[in-house]
A protein has these predicted regions:
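Alpha-helical transmembrane segments of multi-pass membrane proteins
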Residues: 38-51, 77-100
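Core transmembrane alpha-helical segments of multi-pass membrane transporters/permeases
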Residues: 1-23, 38-50, 54
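Lipid-exposed faces of alpha-helical membrane segments in multi-pass integral membrane proteins
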Residues: 43, 47-50, 69, 128, ...
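Transmembrane helix boundary and interhelical junction motifs in multipass membrane proteins
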Residues: 56-67, 99-103
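Helix-coil boundary and interhelical linker segments in multi-pass alpha-helical membrane proteins
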Residues: 22, 26, 32, 70-82, ...
Length: 144
């Protein structure tokens, strides 16, 4: 329980620091002309997936990009439900595709196999889910 509380505390401190620096406003101002609401959820999914894969942390990634992508999505007119779905889906994909994430290590240990073997056996399913998620976010972003 202590690691979760520590992460929450660090998240609030990071949010306060970013707010005082005006980081969110700066990012929104610089990227708004380049983004379209129809493809924004797919972009958020891809960003979340890459960050969660490289860091191995689903919740850490979510706490970093959520304060940035929600104001940005609001400014460009993207659907907030799709944005949250993209953040959660990207984090889940990245966490399960990562070779050293907690989800991979726990699943491999509970099955009694090597973590790399488990990760490689999951990779084709993760890639299929990733492609379907990107297509789904593109379609729903265009419709909603």
């Amino acid at each position: 329980m202590l690691p979760v509380l520590t992460m929450l505390l660090v998240t609030f401190v990071l949010k306060d620091i970013c707010g005082r620096m005006g980081m969110t406003d700066y990012i929104v101002e610089k990227t708004e002309p380049l983004l379209f609401p129809a493809i924004f959820p797919a972009m958020v999914f891809a960003l979340g997936a890459v960050l969660a894969f490289t860091t191995g942390s689903d919740w850490g990634m979510s706490s970093i990009i959520t304060p940035i992508v929600f104001p940005l999505g609001s400014v460009i007119g993207a659907n907030p439900v799709l944005i949250m779905a993209a953040v959660i889906s990207g984090g889940t994909f990245g966490s399960h595709a990562c070779f050293y994430s907690d989800a991979t290590l726990l699943a491999a240990q509970s099955a009694g196999i090597d973590s790399m073997e488990h990760a490689l056996s999951q990779l084709p399913y993760n890639v299929i889910a990733c492609v379907l998620a990107v297509v789904g976010f593109m379609l729903t972003g265009a419709v909603m």
